[in-house]
Amino acid sequence: MSSSENTLLDGKSENTIRFLTFNVNGIRTFFHYQPFSQMNQSLRSVFDFFRADIITFQELKTEKLSISKWGRVDGFYSFISIPQTRKGYSGVGCWIRIPEKNHPLYHALQVVKAEEGITGYLTIKNGKHSAISYRNDVNQGIGGYDSLDPDLDEKSALELDSEGRCVMVELACGIVIISVYCPANSNSSEEGEMFRLRFLKVLLRRVRNLDKIGKKIVLMGDVNVCRDLIDSADTLEQFSIPITDPMGGTKLEAQYRDKAIQFIINPDTPHRRIFNQILADSLLPDASKRGILIDTTRLIQTRNRLKMYTVWNMLKNLRPSNYGSRIDFILVSLKLERCIKAADILPDILGSDHCPVYSDLDILDDRIEPGTTQVPIPKFEARYKYNLRNHNVLEMFAKKDTNKESNKQKYCVSKVMNTKKNSNIKNKSLDSFFQKVNGEKDDRIKESSEIPQQAKKRISTPKLNFKDVFGKPPLCRHGEESMLKTSKTSANPGRKFWICKRSRGDSNNTESSCGFFQWV
């Protein structure tokens, strides 16, 4: 992390609420990267590092047996939604800091209500053997369920909410946080596109409904929509629009106004127009008049800032050249525009193909006074939703299953070896057993008559030199050795070729790939 980003994160006062969104692409895997690798898989350490008060992670890719680790974070309320059937997929978490009682934000950050999904049709426990939908329980549901979609029946609504894509939390200060991971239709199927558009429409209809009943909205997460032309490196290149240092986004959009508008209203990408219709700062005049949300990052950084990307294609190694798009947002109601004090992306934070985005809001006069009555913790809080209060029962069962499998493996290995010293290794771990066989050449192997003598000899395999097989790598236009790749196309499957080893970037960027290509 750069020193400039450290300064940004440190510049937060006690009176501001820091919102942070991060598509972690697997909550376990991002702990493999600095600085998180030194945090012992502690979410509390991660949240303190960011100095964040309200955090949402997308693509948790976790399951019920692992939620005990992420659903009980000291000093935070935890709200987690995971897919109902598909394991290791999607998943959204929202964590709310619990300040000390003498902290200025203590009353403002009190959680009033919380719910899972966007339609209100999902249910929450209502006693030992019963459950009730959020929309039918005024004590749990946040509201705004009317006219979400005229064709949306209960079955369709439950399908929309079955993939663990949204968590909503209402605070005592009147803010409703909507943590979301919108579908992307990565397979480009007709069914996937219909699901994507319906989810987006229902979500934004719910936002409007909540706004009408007086709620202040913070919509944060991976929306999977690139809102403007200046937010898409790929489209800028397709339109042959050069990005030079003196040219800012404002000048670019003025010079290529038609292309900037076409990018939004393109009939092949209806999700962009749908998304822009909720934005008060949209380039579309009609949309901006009806828009009710402000893009905090764009407001603070202005439209003049280019290359403000939040996601990159990692398979093509496009992050080093900053060739990506912006699909992660923190959007707030117009009512909160005056509260926005800071907002930015953190592109130097690794651990995912996305980077974190944060916004600082000072709620000023909207702050709740100390006399406010504290309400019960919502039933959707992870400790209640997933039964994490009673000695971590889920984790106990997980350990039990693991031990059974381990014992089964030990039995099978011992039976196959069938040696005279089985009794001596019965209580040893599987790892130490294999280590001894491979590293110390256990005497039991010598005693076996079934192993031929020639098997004991080391077999030396001649090592082939890379250049002996493919020849010396040709030089690219940068004068550097090129990189060997394998074709995966149907026309030339498995055929080798050389390309420039630098990552793809803007066509006028001399530091990016020169476009060199040569078949082997």
From Swiss-Prot:
The record places its GRF-type zinc fingers at 476-520
Zinc among keywords: yes
Q: Which GO terms describe its cellular component?
A: nucleus
Quote the Pfam families the UniProt record gives: Exo_endo_phos, Zn_ribbon_GRF
Q: Which SUPFAM superfamilies match?
A: DNase I-like
Which residues take part in binding Zn(2+)?
Answer: 476, 478, 500, 514
Which residues are involved in binding Mg(2+) 1? 59, 353
Q: Which InterPro entries match?
A: AP_endonuc_1, AP_endonuclease_F1_CS, Endo/exonu/phosph_ase_sf, Endo/exonuclease/phosphatase, Znf_GRF
Tell me the Gene3D superfamilies matching this sequence.
Endonuclease/exonuclease/phosphatase
The prosthetic group or cofactor this protein requires is: Mg(2+); Mn(2+)
> Which top-rank group of organisms is this from?
Eukaryota
Where do the catalytic residues lie? Answer: 181, 222 (proton donor/acceptor)
Query: GO BP, one example?
Result: base-excision repair
Keywords per UniProt: DNA damage, DNA repair, Hydrolase, Magnesium, Metal-binding, Nucleus, Zinc, Zinc-finger
Q: Which GO terms describe its molecular function?
A: 3'-5' exonuclease activity; DNA binding; DNA-(apurinic or apyrimidinic site) endonuclease activity; double-stranded DNA 3'-5' DNA exonuclease activity; endonuclease activity; phosphoric diester hydrolase activity; zinc ion binding
Other known facts: Present with 414 molecules/cell in log phase SD medium.
Q: What protein family does this chain belong to? A: Belongs to the DNA repair enzymes AP/ExoA family.
Sorted alphabetically, which PANTHER family does this protein's record hold? AP ENDONUCLEASE (PTHR22748), DNA-(APURINIC OR APYRIMIDINIC SITE) ENDONUCLEASE 2 (PTHR22748:SF4)
What function does this protein fulfil? Answer: DNA repair enzyme that cleaves apurinic/apyrimidinic (AP) sites and removes 3'-blocking groups present at single strand breaks of damaged DNA.
- What's this protein's name? DNA-(apurinic or apyrimidinic site) endonuclease 2
Underlying gene? APN2
